[in-house]
């Protein structure tokens, strides 16, 4: 656990003009003493709880490893990231032998759920002005706005944060949506990696491949070098998901043998359509059937 000395040294090792140092009791009370009913996530870097802090819904992450130089370096960076299309670190607290990071909470959850989860898909309010209008899947204009928001968030990471960082895990489950369905890229600790070179195009050798199958750029898997182009590939897969409504990787049981599960890459699926003589017809068949109104020219672009 933390000693009082290590707690203080950890907190004072990073600074921010905006991050708030919350008293521990506020974090504890906000999460109902870290109740299991408030738990909304679990990852290699810690546990995430939903909390109500000073009248605002927040996501509270209880961190595991907080003593490494890499942790403090990335924490310093996150404290000073402020962009409307990135999940923002609001503040931190120390107590109960843990460090807690407080993030803004995205009320509408992950984009992946809205595209692929049957219990969530179709819960987009078609006409929010008319409360009786009912719900409908994401319209074309909303999907375009989400894609644009993600692009702006990633651009901010690449152009406005020094030294260079990349995300490493751009995917629909790391794209969160606020109450207005504005895209918020989740770049919480553990997702970004410092590029050791001075050029973001050169990249840095990864000690291990980090990311998600279906979103990994082939050259990253082959050579093990992380660059912004690795993220751009993942962003391209996100665009294909927005267009097709299909996940990046599908699991299909073989009709001959139900025990055999074949993984189909969305990228391969779309590329096979493009490789067809009648590719426009094939591509049209790849489009999400829930998209009833869209401009073909802009979609195929």
Give the ranges of each region predicted by the language model:
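Cytosolic eukaryotic protein kinase-like domains
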Residues: 2-18, 22-26, 59-76, 87-145, ...
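Protein kinase glycine-rich loop
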Residues: 37-48
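Conserved alphaC helix of the protein kinase catalytic domain
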Residues: 38, 76-79
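Conserved N-lobe motifs of Hanks-type protein kinase catalytic domains
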Residues: 43, 81-84
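Glycine-rich ATP phosphate-binding loop
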Residues: 47-65
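Protein kinase catalytic-loop region centered on the HRD/HxD motif
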Residues: 152-165
């Amino acid at each position: 656990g933390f000693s009082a000395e290590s707690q203080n040294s950890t907190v004072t090792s990073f600074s921010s003009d905006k991050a708030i140092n919350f008293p521990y009791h506020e974090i504890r009370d906000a999460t109902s003493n870290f109740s299991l009913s408030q738990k909304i996530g679990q990852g290699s870097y810690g546990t995430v709880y939903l909390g109500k802090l000073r009248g605002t819904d927040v996501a509270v992450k209880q961190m595991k490893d907080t003593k490494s130089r890499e942790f403090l370096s990335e924490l310093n960076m996150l404290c000073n990231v402020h962009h409307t299309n990135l999940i923002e670190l609001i503040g931190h607290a120390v107590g109960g032998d843990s460090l807690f990071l407080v993030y803004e909470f995205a009320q509408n959850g992950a984009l992946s759920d809205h595209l692929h989860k049957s219990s969530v898909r179709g819960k987009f309010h078609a006409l929010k002005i008319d409360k009786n209008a009912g719900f409908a899947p994401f319209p074309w204009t909303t999907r375009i706005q989400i894609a644009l928001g993600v692009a702006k968030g990633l651009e901010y990471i690449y152009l406005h944060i020094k030294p260079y960082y990349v995300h490493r895990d751009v995917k629909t489950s790391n794209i969160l949506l606020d109450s207005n369905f504005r895209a918020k890229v989740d770049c919480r600790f553990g997702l970004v990696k410092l590029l050791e070179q001075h050029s973001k195009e050169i990249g840095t050798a990864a000690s291990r491949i980090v990311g998600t199958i279906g979103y990994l750029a082939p050259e990253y898997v082959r050579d093990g070098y992380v660059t912004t182009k690795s993220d751009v590939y993942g962003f391209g897969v996100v665009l294909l998901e927005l267009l097709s409504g299909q996940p990046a990787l599908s699991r299909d049981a073989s009709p001959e043998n139900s025990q055999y599960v074949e993984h189909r890459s969305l990228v391969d699926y779309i590329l096979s359509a493009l490789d067809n003589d009648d590719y426009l017809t094939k591509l049209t068949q790849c489009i999400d059937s829930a998209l009833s109104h869209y401009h073909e020219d802009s979609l195929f672009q």
